[in-house]
Design a protein with these regions (language model features):
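Anionic ligand-binding catalytic core segments
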Residues: 1-34, 38-150
Length: 150
């Protein structure tokens, strides 16, 4: 059986994975599980699957978690017994993908206008109750701030 490379440009695939994680975190989709990170394709045309359920689950208190899977030690304790915060976890995850921290910073800058527009877009959702809108807006704002704190 022939072997096909999954991605011709592994750095680009790693960057895409990091970007997908950031978008899930910033949109309040605390449900970024492996189904939403699966690979699809056949022959030599493999790639990431679409996001199957982009619902911002963190709008609902019962589902308000940052991510279902740990990354970069987020929430764990460091060598001094302090919790690993989001920015450090993102830096660690970025490094584990073989990317530079400057790539993370560039992605944060690229996504910032999209994320900053989310509160207005959330407020425009006619079927989402005000309580859930408020929670989701807080999540979006706090997550962006935490990701940028160095």
């Amino acid at each position: 059986m022939a072997r096909f490379p999954l991605f011709a440009d592994k750095k680009q695939a790693a960057r895409h994975l990091l970007k997908r994680l950031l978008l899930a975190l910033f949109s309040g989709n605390g449900d970024l599980h492996l189904e939403n990170l699966s690979l699809t394709g056949e022959h030599a045309a493999y790639g990431f699957s679409p996001v199957y359920d982009p619902t911002p689950m963190r709008a609902y208190s019962i589902h308000n978690m940052l991510a279902p899977m740990s990354f970069g030690g987020y929430g764990d304790l460091d060598e001094n017994g302090n919790p690993v915060h989001l920015r450090l976890a993102l830096e660690r995850f970025t490094a584990s993908l073989g990317l530079r921290i400057t790539t993370l910073d560039r992605l944060l800058q690229e996504l910032r206008p999209v994320v900053e527009s989310l509160p207005d877009r959330i407020n425009d959702l006619s079927r989402l109750p005000a309580e859930h809108k408020d929670r989701l807006i807080r999540v979006v704002t706090m997550t962006l701030d935490a990701a940028q704190q160095g």
